[in-house]
UniProtKB/Swiss-Prot annotation:
Coiled coil: none
GO terms (BP aspect): translation
Molecular function via GO: large ribosomal subunit rRNA binding; structural constituent of ribosome
Descriptive protein name: Large ribosomal subunit protein uL14
Function, as annotated: Binds to 23S rRNA. Forms part of two intersubunit bridges in the 70S ribosome.
Gene encoding the protein: rplN
Family that this chain belongs to: Belongs to the universal ribosomal protein uL14 family.
Transmembrane portions of the chain: none
Listed HAMAP family: Ribosomal_uL14 (MF_01367)
Keyword terms: Ribonucleoprotein, Ribosomal protein, RNA-binding, rRNA-binding
């Protein structure tokens, strides 16, 4: 579960390394985000020469959470870290590579470009 002020690792090569959640999008008063949800973030740590700069406000989609998610068959999937991918307004990623595995739940929300770039879909 990702909420306001949560810091996440960025799992792409957009230039951001770490982001801080400002807001969870999707309905008024929504408190938490899970895998596949869009959040508004600010970049706290960035690589020099990247597309995204430190202090920039960006949108991102959550691809891994420590709390995990329950699937329809009753199984759970959890990851070792909270991670996101920086996206544009049309749901396409700003980076050209994705690092680490992503959850299959992204397919339900039509993030096909992220799934195709990911090295592993769990």
């Amino acid at each position: 579960m990702i909420q306001q002020e949560t810091r996440l690792k960025v799992a792409d090569n957009s230039g951001a390394r770490e982001v801080l959640t400002i807001k969870v999008l999707g309905g008024s008063g929504r408190k938490t985000a899970n895998i596949g949800d869009v959040i508004v973030c600010t970049v706290k740590n960035a690589t020099p020469g990247g597309v995204v700069k430190k202090g920039e406000v960006v949108k991102a989609v959550v691809v891994r959470t420590k709390s995990g998610v329950r699937r329809k068959d009753g199984s759970y999937i959890k990851f070792d870290e909270n991670a996101c991918v920086v996206i544009r307004d049309d749901k396409s990623p700003r980076g050209t590579r994705i690092f680490g595995p992503v959850a299959r739940e992204l397919r339900d929300n039509n993030y096909m470009k992220i799934i195709s770039l990911a090295p592993e879909v769990l």
